[in-house]
């Protein structure tokens, strides 16, 4: 059955889910297949988090964080995240930066400061946006909303592999504990808690390959009558 959601000339596919659920990889491949723009919303938060650390801004200093975000020079180019013209793609994936990003995201004004930047990524021919609240808050009119899930154990194993490949040392037990703590914090925060949109498609990637997950998203998109 086709969606009754109104047609938008610039379609958006949202892919939300917890940390290390595979949403970033799936989103990038779906975007590449469709020729769409890509928004890694988590990278925006991590860029703000990294900048706050580098400039010595406390995670609880809301006014300073908002001003920092307003003044940040952020660009995404050829798969790289740049802060002030410098590629910081590896820096923002460090666990400490991820924890800081989750900590500052609990502040409503911080989220408001980043919303406009996220929505500005919606450009023709379309956008694939991955994050935690893309389908519930940022793009509620998305033509397709996907929420990825996976067991904490599977996600910890993926995160461990990612970090080791990038040259970071990591302990899988510590990663598993951190993931569970972040899940609880992200799910229980007052502003835009981590949860699937009411009309989201749920996709458990625990036992799926990346290609299988991408194929499922594309099948759902085609089922809406969209060219894929």
UniProtKB/Swiss-Prot annotation:
- Residue positions binding ATP: 17-25
Q: Gene3D superfamilies annotated for this entry? A: P-loop containing nucleotide triphosphate hydrolases
Q: Name one GO cellular component term.
A: cytosol
Q: Give the Gene Ontology MF terms in alphabetical order.
A: ATP binding; CMP kinase activity; dCMP kinase activity
GO terms, biological process: nucleobase-containing small molecule interconversion; pyrimidine nucleotide metabolic process
Q: Name one Pfam family in it.
A: Cytidylate_kin
EC number(s) recorded for this UniProt protein: 2.7.4.25
Which keywords, in A-to-Z order, does the entry hold? ATP-binding, Cytoplasm, Kinase, Nucleotide-binding, Transferase
Name the enzyme group at the top EC level.
transferase
Q: Which reaction does it catalyse?
A: CMP + ATP = CDP + ADP; dCMP + ATP = dCDP + ADP
Primary site of residence: cytoplasm
Keyword Repeat part of the UniProt annotation: no
The keyword Kinase is annotated on this UniProt entry: yes
Q: Where in the cell is it found?
A: Cytoplasm
Q: Which PANTHER family match?
A: CYTIDYLATE KINASE (PTHR21299:SF2), CYTIDYLATE KINASE/PANTOATE-BETA-ALANINE LIGASE (PTHR21299)
The entry sums up its family as follows: Belongs to the cytidylate kinase family. Type 1 subfamily.
Q: Which NCBIfam families match?
A: cmk (TIGR00017)
Q: What is this protein called?
A: Cytidylate kinase
Q: Tell me which species this is from.
A: Burkholderia vietnamiensis (strain G4 / LMG 22486) (Burkholderia cepacia (strain R1808))
Identify the gene encoding this protein. Answer: cmk
């Amino acid at each position: 059955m086709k969606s009754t959601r109104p047609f938008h000339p610039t379609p958006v596919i949202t892919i939300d889910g917890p940390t290390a659920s595979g949403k970033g990889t799936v989103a990038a491949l779906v975007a590449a297949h469709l020729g769409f723009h890509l928004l890694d919303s988590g990278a925006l938060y991590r860029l703000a988090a990294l900048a706050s650390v580098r400039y010595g801004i406390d995670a609880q200093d809301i006014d300073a964080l908002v001003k920092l975000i307003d003044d940040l020079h952020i660009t995404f180019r050829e798969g790289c995240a740049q802060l002030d013209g410098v590629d910081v793609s590896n820096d923002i994936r460090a666990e400490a930066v991820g924890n800081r990003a989750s900590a500052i995201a609990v502040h409503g004004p911080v989220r408001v400061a980043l919303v406009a930047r996220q929505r500005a990524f919606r450009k023709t021919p379309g956008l694939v946006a991955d994050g935690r609240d893309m389908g519930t808050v940022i793009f509620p009119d998305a033509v397709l909303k996907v929420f990825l899930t996976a067991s904490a154990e599977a996600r910890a194993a993926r995160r461990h592999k990612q970090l080791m490949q990038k040259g970071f040392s990591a302990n899988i037990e510590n990663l598993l504990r951190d993931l569970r703590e972040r899940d609880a914090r992200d799910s229980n925060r007052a502003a835009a808690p981590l949860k699937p949109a009411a009309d989201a498609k749920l996709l458990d990637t625990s036992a799926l390959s990346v290609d299988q997950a991408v194929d499922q998203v594309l099948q759902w998109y085609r089922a809406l009558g969209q060219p894929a």
